[in-house]
Curated annotation (Swiss-Prot):
This is Brevinin-1Pe. The keyword Flavoprotein does not apply. InterPro entries: Antimicrobial_frog_1. One of its GO terms (biological process) is defense response to fungus. Expressed by the skin glands. It comes from Lithobates pipiens. Keywords: Amphibian defense peptide, Antibiotic, Antimicrobial, Disulfide bond, Fungicide, Secreted.
Length: 24
């Protein structure tokens, strides 16, 4: 497991969750 993947996921996941939950 790479720290780079973790950092990218930390940036991408909130945007995906925001789009799904419509809580921006």
């Amino acid at each position: 497991f790479l720290p780079i993947i973790a950092s990218v996921a930390a940036k991408v996941f909130p945007k995906i969750f925001c789009a799904i939950s419509k809580k921006c």
